[in-house]
Swiss-Prot record:
HAMAP family: YegS
Gene symbol of the encoding locus: yegS
EC number of this enzyme: 2.7.1.-
PANTHER family from the UniProt entry: LIPID KINASE YEGS, SPHINGOSINE KINASE
Protein name in the entry: Probable lipid kinase YegS
Cofactor remark from the record: Binds 1 Mg(2+) ion per subunit. Ca(2+) may be able to substitute.
Domain of life: Bacteria
Main function: Probably phosphorylates lipids; the in vivo substrate is unknown.
Cellular localisation: Cytoplasm
GO-annotated biological processes: phospholipid biosynthetic process
Domain DAGKc: 2-133
Lineage, broadest ranks: Bacteria, Pseudomonadati, Pseudomonadota, Gammaproteobacteria, Enterobacterales
Length: 299
């Protein structure tokens, strides 16, 4: 078989007992591939392992986990300086795997691993919030954010992405919109939002298509605001034709500014960030990612 450069897998500690993954790695090693494996234990491990990966001279750093793990690894990669920065590979092992699913990463471990190692590396965008925190997939605010951050771990482990819908339905009686003002390029809106989605990717919360028109290499962020009483169809993903729906506000811009009279929380690839003022901007072609040739999120 063809020779491939070495790669380093950064594996979320929750997946250390994944026997099928261990077998898939061993088989690829027997085929001649060099795959280093490092396991995360605490915040900051991913950045340290990316630094180690550069010293090892690997061509790819594979994020093995959910959206949070992909976020940590990709953030560490875009902070690297100099030449020969490794590409990002994706091995979906989380609860929802929203980003991996939307870009077409195979569910089968062996196929996902081979793609992460040998797939074409394509330049994609990332987004940055307040010049500090980054996200590769989506920033979500409002009721949807509270659901994804409050859903019990045991429920997520048992039911996967469906758990977010179930927990959301259980919490319908606590619905409270977030009042805010949002500005962007040729965009201005002010009002009460039940759900805010600002996407580099398209889906969040276990498969909810919040920003269905988003692309990861167009230099733009897609915005979708759900107002009124549209939270239920948003949660169960049964929104019918919404082109003329007055409860859905859409926009596209390379940046958005959000101001709120009270503290609101955004979920950035699974990590909550609270405040009253947010500046979210796109970082064009921020890193290279190994993606399938038919990735639907590429222009």
């Amino acid at each position: 078989m063809a020779e491939f450069p070495a790669s380093l897998l950064i594996l979320n500690g929750k997946s250390t007992d994944n026997l099928p993954l261990r077998e898939a790695i061993m088989l690829l090693r027997e085929e001649g591939m060099t795959i280093h494996v490092r396991v995360t234990w605490e915040k900051g491990d991913a950045a340290r392992y990316v630094e180690e990966a550069r010293k090892l001279g690997v061509a790819t750093v594979i994020a093995g986990g959910g959206d949070g793990t992909i976020n940590e690894v990709s953030t560490a990669l875009i902070q690297c300086e100099g030449d020969d920065i490794p590409a990002l590979g994706i091995l979906p092992l989380g609860t929802a795997n929203d980003f991996a699913t939307s870009v077409g990463i195979p569910e089968a471990l062996d196929k996902a691993l081979k793609l992460a190692i040998a797939g074409n590396a394509i330049a994609i965008d990332m987004a940055q919030v307040n010049k500090q925190t980054c996200f590769i997939n989506m920033a979500t605010g409002g009721f949807g954010t509270r659901i994804t951050t409050e859903t019990p771990e045991k429920l997520k482990a048992a039911l996967g992405g469906v758990s977010y819908i179930i927990h959301g339905l259980m919490r319908m009686d606590t619905l409270q919109p977030d009042r805010c003002e949002i500005r962007g390029e040729n965009f201005h809106w002010q009002g009460d939002a039940l759900v805010i989605g600002i996407g580099n990717g398209r889906q969040a919360g276990g498969g909810q298509q919040l920003c269905p028109n988003a692309l990861i290499n167009d230099g733009l962020l897609q915005l979708r605001i759900f107002t009124g009483d549209e939270i239920l169809p948003a949660l169960v993903s049964t929104l019918k034709s919404d082109e003329d729906n007055p409860n859905i506000i859409e926009g596209a811009s390379s940046w958005f500014d959000i101001q709120a009279p009270h503290e609101i929380t955004f979920n950035l690839d699974g990590e909550p960030l609270s405040g009253q003022n947010f500046h979210i901007e796109i970082l064009p072609a921020a890193l290279r990612c190994r993606l399938p040739p038919d990735c639907p999120l590429l222009r």
